[in-house]
Amino acid sequence: MFSVEFVSLFTEICSGGSVWGTSGQRILSEFSLDPFTKMELIRDGVLVFGRDFRNLLSFPSRAEVLRAIQRHYEAIRKYGASDAGWLLDTARCLYTLKTNQIAAKTAAGEWALEHHLCPNPEVMEKALEIRRNPEKLLKDESVTAWLKTITPQIQEFADVLENALQKEMHSGSEI
């Protein structure tokens, strides 16, 4: 994925940007610099023009990261249906929760499989296959029919994230 962000150093509000991903291009007029974006900018941002300001950004606290994961978890519970991307989003949340790092969706899905976190590994494997070749596979009627059936598996994987978040909260971390 490639994204462009224009950041106000005083408010940490992005005044605009473009995001390119497998679902296409989106142009945003404004969005907040959330903990995930801050982590990516600080660790992996590439300056294209102007003065590098990453040293002026504060790395998100563990509590901020946990709150961001919690918000994403709530979105998965509310909207997570019939789209393999929700499985990969869940894997990214788990990866960040366990490592305090950010990973690409594909890498996070592979990591979740390697660490035996997926209650339905065959579903994650199919999600990764779609992620690697979306133009071909999303035109396949059998794939689109399959996607309509995976809501229970998305929510079951969200259970894994819920349990990991609860375990983190009980270990003394604040959300």
Describe each region flagged by the PLM:
Residues 2-3, 86, 174-175:
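Short glycine-rich, low-complexity/disordered patches
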Residues 74-106:
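Hydrophobic alpha-helical packing segments in soluble, helical-rich domains
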Residues 101, 105-175:
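Structured mid-to-C-terminal alpha-helical surface segments
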